[in-house]
Curated annotation (Swiss-Prot):
GO molecular function, one term: dTMP kinase activity
EC numbers for this chain: 2.7.4.9
GO CC annotation: cytosol
The reaction(s) this protein catalyses: dTMP + ATP = dTDP + ADP
Source species of the chain: Bacillus cereus (strain ATCC 10987 / NRS 248)
InterPro entries: P-loop_NTPase, Thymidylate_kin-like_dom, Thymidylate_kin_CS, Thymidylate_kinase
This protein's name: Thymidylate kinase
Coiled-coil stretches: none
PANTHER family documented for this protein: THYMIDYLATE KINASE (PTHR10344), UMP-CMP KINASE 2, MITOCHONDRIAL (PTHR10344:SF4)
Recorded name of the encoding gene: tmk
Keywords: ATP-binding, Kinase, Nucleotide biosynthesis, Nucleotide-binding, Transferase
UniProt record, GO biological process: dTDP biosynthetic process; dTTP biosynthetic process; dUDP biosynthetic process
Amino acid sequence: MKGLFVTIEGPEGSGKTTLIQGLLPYFEQKEQKVMATREPGGIAISEDIRTILHKQEYTMMEARTEALLYAAARRQHLVEKVMPALDEDYLVLCDRFIDSSLAYQGYARGLGMDKVFEINRFATEDCMPSLTIYLDIEPEVGLARIAKDAGREVNRLDMEDITFHKRVREGYLQVVERFSDRIVLVNADQPMEKLIEEVIQVIEDKLL
């Protein structure tokens, strides 16, 4: 792989999607080949899995089922979209990757980070990001943002109680500590314009 694989992580309402849309024009005007994608999703098979994972009525979904579905969506997305783009020297900006599974299923769902990491090592064949930006935000702030966003569809994970969302953040902070060589923590509780500027600087300092 010749390209650069940058993943954007964070709890619900941290601004990942908006951030990526703000990063795209900057790198495009610099004539950098850049592509944005998301997990779960990005391609037809993985988008179908996303629909299953996000259905509000599927509250009975068991934690291992959830973890395996995310890993399956990740595998197909990786081989069908991400790896080919990296081979063509793209900068790939991905909304979520393996660290989401570690924080959500490994820590918040209680499956254990090591177990979930091994599932995802198998799914990704140890393909890891060049750089990960973790957008840190208090769960209450993130969920309040979601509540104000009339255009955002509320999914099954959004509906979890505040205790779950606090555990997700705790999990992420452990992931940041565990993979400090590739993860940079950025405060997401700031104006989006400033957040975009800060993340651009991090990407350029670390990779370009």
